[in-house]
């Protein structure tokens, strides 16, 4: 169901930036307000320990919250 991936308007206090796997990002990028807590609805794999999904504009990032590193980037996830 394509509408499951339709995102609402996304506003962030920072500009869009493409993140690659393995890069470190600031904790403000994975603050609680940007977390995707209902990852099952989007058919995303269960995050591992100390990992969380966050929305960055139309992308979803799987981030290790202890290190700030991007584990997996899903670009263009929302439309």
PLM features per residue range, with description:
Residues 1-79:
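Low-complexity segments
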């Amino acid at each position: 169901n394509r509408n499951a991936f339709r995102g609402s308007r996304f506003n962030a206090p920072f500009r869009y930036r493409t993140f690659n796997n393995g890069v470190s990002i600031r904790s403000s990028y994975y603050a609680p307000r940007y977390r995707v807590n209902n990852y099952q609805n989007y058919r995303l794999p269960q995050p591992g320990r100390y990992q969380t999904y966050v929305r960055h504009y139309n992308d979803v990032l799987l981030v290790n919250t202890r290190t700030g590193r991007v584990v997996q980037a899903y670009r263009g996830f929302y439309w």
